[in-house]
Curated annotation (Swiss-Prot):
Subunit and interaction comment: Monomer.
Entry EC no(s): 3.1.3.77
Catalytic activity, as annotated: 5-methylsulfanyl-2,3-dioxopentyl phosphate + H2O = 1,2-dihydroxy-5-(methylsulfanyl)pent-1-en-3-one + phosphate
Gene label: Enoph1
Pathway in which the depicted protein is active: Amino-acid biosynthesis; L-methionine biosynthesis via salvage pathway; L-methionine from S-methyl-5-thio-alpha-D-ribose 1-phosphate: step 3/6; Amino-acid biosynthesis; L-methionine biosynthesis via salvage pathway; L-methionine from S-methyl-5-thio-alpha-D-ribose 1-phosphate: step 4/6
Name used for this protein in its record: Enolase-phosphatase E1
Role according to the record: Bifunctional enzyme that catalyzes the enolization of 2,3-diketo-5-methylthiopentyl-1-phosphate (DK-MTP-1-P) into the intermediate 2-hydroxy-3-keto-5-methylthiopentenyl-1-phosphate (HK-MTPenyl-1-P), which is then dephosphorylated to form the acireductone 1,2-dihydroxy-3-keto-5-methylthiopentene (DHK-MTPene).
Length: 257
């Protein structure tokens, strides 16, 4: 087993989700298809609710910002618009954003609310790699703080950890960050996270499967290890040489233990 030693100054472990704690297949084959298959029904069922209207309003604002993009789908204002046409416009906008792998806050918020309904109804449970929960327990026993940083909304993150095949494991996580604090490819985001936690950036070890994110974190003086999991994107030879690579959280060695 390859062992990566965690620097002594590290007191916080920051985790990505997709491809790091959770198989990409679960996200791509379960979570996202659920949105596409159910968004129209969800909107029709919840349209009059305040939460749903807030989601639609945020999507409309995003659509206005996206108006200059090729193929962007507008969402008309409610007045004078046929309800089914309105709903279809929102559905089409969601499809368009997802087809372009957009990670807008507006899209993530609606997805989070849809997943909440599905998870709380027991229609799905989140999957984690087998090494994740035992490792997080060990880290916490060693005095580490554990945080999540994902492009998925904080609400969606809490759903995953609260409704998993391992049960409710939210108690193992000290806090959550999403794109509201900044994008994961922007080094400033990691400085903001450190400020929010109340530590220095070099007190953080970030685990991610995406080297562009790892590079951004390093620019902020955050320690990184790149996680290699089944189904993840391949790495270049240079990336394999440059980064500390792990295939399991059990390969991290804490000097304090």
């Amino acid at each position: 087993m390859v062992v990566v030693s965690v620097p002594a100054e590290v007191t916080v472990i920051l985790l990505d989700i997709e491809g790091t704690t959770t198989p990409i297949a679960f996200v791509k084959d379960v979570l996202f298809p659920y949105i596409k298959e159910n968004v129209k029904e969800y909107l029709q069922t919840h349209w009059e609710e305040e939460e749903c209207q807030q989601d639609v309003s945020l999507l409309r604002k995003q659509a206005e910002e996206d108006a200059h993009l090729d193929g962007a789908v507008p969402i008309p204002v409610a007045s004078g618009s046929d309800l089914q046409q309105m709903i279809q416009a929102v559905v089409d906008n969601v499809y368009w954003q997802m087809s372009h792998d957009r990670k807008t806050t507006a899209l993530k918020q609606l997805q989070g609310h849809m997943w909440k309904a599905a998870f709380t109804a027991g229609r799905m449970k989140a999957e984690f790699f087998a090494d994740v929960v035992p490792a997080v327990r060990r880290w916490r026993e060693a005095g580490m703080k554990v945080y999540i940083y994902s492009s998925g909304s904080v609400e969606a993150q809490k759903l995953l950890f609260g409704h998993s095949t391992e049960g409710d494991i939210l108690e193992l996580i000290d806090g959550h960050f999403d794109t509201k604090i900044g994008h994961k490819v922007d080094s400033e985001s990691y400085r903001k996270i450190a400020d929010s936690i109340g530590c220095s950036t070099n007190n953080i070890l970030f685990l991610t499967d995406v080297t562009v994110e790892a590079s951004a974190a390093e620019e902020a003086d955050v320690h990184v290890a790149v996680v290699v999991r089944p189904g993840n994107a391949g790495l270049t030879d240079d990336e394999k040489t440059y980064y500390n690579l792990i295939t399991s959280f059990s390969e991290l060695y804490l000097p304090s233990t």
